[in-house]
Every structure is written in structure tokens, then in C-alpha cells.
A protein has these predicted regions:
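Short, small-residue-biased leader/transition segments that mark boundaries at the very start
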Residues: 2-9
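Conserved donor-binding loop and adjoining core beta-sheet/short helix segment
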Residues: 13-74, 164-181, 186-187
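Acyl-donor-binding surface of acyltransferase catalytic domains
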Residues: 44-116, 235-242
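Conserved acetyl-CoA-binding loop-helix of GNAT-fold acetyltransferases
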Residues: 58-68, 185, 191-205, 227
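Conserved GNAT acetyl-CoA-binding A-motif
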Residues: 73-82, 206-218
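Conserved active-site tyrosine of GNAT-family acetyltransferases
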Residues: 88-92, 224-226, 230
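Flexible, substrate/cofactor-facing loop regions flanked by secondary structure
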Residues: 112-177
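Short glycine/proline-centered loop/turn elements that form peptide/ligand docking sites
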Residues: 199, 219-224
Length: 245
């Protein structure tokens, strides 16, 4: 598997570790052909993820069926392995547009700066900072709080707070990899390099703790993250559902 491929699978694994199969907002489906299991689909709230099992591939017939499954279920976003980007984007283009993103891996210098970082912040304090930055979070406080606290309690996620103005959340911690998710700074403190400092601190701290630290960002942010100490290691595509006006 490529790193992007393993990221999709790891996130599916973290969903399963957090919730299992007993909740109606998380579903798993097997991808099969001629009785052989090729991969797995997960649907968590409105997000779908598709991954292959090790040494398995999707042929054009299976990709056509996956496209039909996507169009039938109409998730808000679909993530999958980069090698299938062009084909699935073409097959679903009537209702989805492809959004490229770059995957980064942190390259540590083994030098943790002396920042006063709260590693166990109150999640309400984290939400207060993220809400102005991410409308989807702002509009779903209870859902965000329930999911984040559930994962934190199980050691699958962690939030960090720098002062009372910048935060970052680890979206998952599984199989020795920590994926950095939402990073935000309150509007009046932006432009002061707080997020940059916090991300560097997190990268060094988690590397020291034995984790690989990764994150995803839009391609135009490559230079920003490289300056912090992240190195681009892949590009993939996320399908975003086209909102009909």
C-alpha cells in the first residue's frame, strides 16, 4: 500500500476501534468480486472511505460498481486510494468534483521548543477556537463534542491548546501513526505564527513519543508546511458532492 492508501485504511480502523458496528451513523461494507474480498467501504456520518486489502486491486468492473454505490448513497465526501482517482472522478463527475490534497510527513530535528502547550484541554475551549475556522464544526457542536470526547477517552485522538488562541487535534492515533486534523487560531491572533509553532511542537513531541506524524493539506499550502518541517509524500483526490443550487 502507498502511504495515502494506508491512511484511508487506518482511519477506517480507527472508526472501528472507536465504535465497532453497533451505531447507526457508522456502516461497513465488504467489496467483493467472484467471492473474493477485495476491500472495505466505511460510511461515517456523511463521509465515505474506500480501501483495498493488502495485495488486492479494483478492476474497471469493480470501480464501476463502486461509482454506482457512491451515486446511490450520495455521501458528502469520498476518500480512496490515489491510484483510482482519475477513474472514480470520471465515473462520478455528474454529482462530484475532485479536490486534490497533499499528504505530508513530519521530519523531526529532535528539538522540542519550550512552548506552554496544554495536552489535556477542555474540549469546549478547543471548540471555541475551531468554530470560527470551520463552519461544519460550528454548526454541529454536539456531534463534534460527542465524537471527539469518545475518541480521546479511548486513546484514539488528542487535542492540544497553545495559550487560549491556537489549537490542533490529532484525528487518529493508530498503528504508530498520528494524523493531525483540525488546526485553528482565533481571528485576532492570526498572522503571529502560533499555528506554525504548535504544529512544530506537536511534530517533535509525537515523534519523540514514537509516532509518525502526518497531515493533509491543499497543494497551495505545500511551502507553508515544508517550512515547519513537514515533507510532501503524496497527492490524492477527495470527491466532494456538488451542491445543487
Amino acid at each position: 500500500r502507498s502511504s495515502a492508501a494506508s491512511d484511508v485504511y487506518k482511519r477506517q480502523k480507527s472508526h472501528f476501534a472507536a465504535y465497532g458496528t453497533g451505531y447507526d451513523f457508522l456502516h461497513f461494507y465488504a467489496v467483493e468480486e467472484s467471492g473474493k474480498k477485495l476491500g472495505i467501504i466505511s460510511v461515517f456520518n456523511a463521509s465515505m472511505m474506500i480501501s483495498t486489502f493488502k495485495d488486492k486491486r479494483f478492476d474497471d468492473k469493480v470501480l464501476g460498481e463502486l461509482a454506482g454505490f457512491i451515486l446511490m448513497n450520495k455521501p458528502a465526501a469520498v476518500e480512496f486510494e490515489a491510484e483510482y482517482s482519475d477513474k472514480l472522478a470520471e465515473l462520478t463527475k455528474a454529482e462530484y468534483k475532485g479536490d486534490k490534497r497533499t499528504e505530508f510527513s513530519f521530519v523531526a530535528k529532535n528539538d522540542i521548543p519550550p512552548l506552554d502547550v496544554n495536552e489535556l484541554p477542555k474540549l469546549d475551549d478547543v471548540f471555541r477556537i475551531l468554530a470560527p475556522c470551520f463552519p461544519a464544526i460550528k454548526n454541529s457542536y454536539e456531534l463534534w463534542l460527542t465524537d471527539t470526547s469518545h475518541r480521546v477517552r479511548r486513546g484514539l485522538s488528542q487535542s492540544f491548546l497553545l495559550g487560549n488562541y491556537t489549537t490542533a487535534t490529532i484525528q487518529y492515533i493508530i498503528d504508530g501513526v498520528a494524523l493531525v486534523g483540525h488546526v485553528g487560531t482565533i481571528p485576532e491572533e492570526r498572522g503571529k505564527f502560533h499555528a506554525r509553532q504548535l504544529l512544530y511542537w506537536i511534530g517533535e513531541k509525537l515523534t519523540q513519543d514514537g509516532f509518525q506524524v502526518r497531515l493533509f493539506a491543499r497543494p497551495h499550502r505545500v511551502s507553508y508546511y515544508e517550512e515547519i518541517g513537514f515533507k510532501a509524500c503524496g497527492i490524492d483526490l477527495v470527491l466532494e458532492r456538488i451542491e445543487n443550487e
